């Protein structure tokens, strides 16, 4: 039976050889030394193929959240629902206010009313003088 031992990676931060211990399925553990010249701030791992840089003094430290992913997702959805709900509530309230203010305004009189629509349709010139006295500015009424 074969046992698998987790691979270990040992590196130094200065220039020098790095040692790798890898596990194989046939229980033969080999230790290889690879002279890999790396800078003091660069460590390349053989298994991931990525270059990892240690955090520098100027970099920000990543926050460790005390909440699980589910709780964070629920918080985000709750905030989104609150924002969308507030927008919908404001639009609903503004529509209700607009409908209320329109009902307070007097409707236009029907076209059959006795109010003349234009000066061409006026039949009695004496009525137009009385109507014009209400619509003319004060200076013009005082002169006539």
From Swiss-Prot:
Recorded GO CC terms: ankyrin-1 complex; plasma membrane
Gene3D superfamilies: 1.20.5.70
A Pfam family per the record: Glycophorin_A
Xref: InterPro entries: Glycophorin (IPR001195), Glycophorin_CS (IPR018938), GYPA_B (IPR049535)
PROSITE patterns reported for this sequence: GLYCOPHORIN_A (PS00312)
Lipid bilayer topology: Single-pass type I membrane protein
Span list, region Disordered: 1-55, 101-144
Primary location recorded for the protein, binned into one broad class: membrane
Protein name: Glycophorin-A
UniProt organism field: Macaca fuscata fuscata
Gene name per UniProt: GYPA
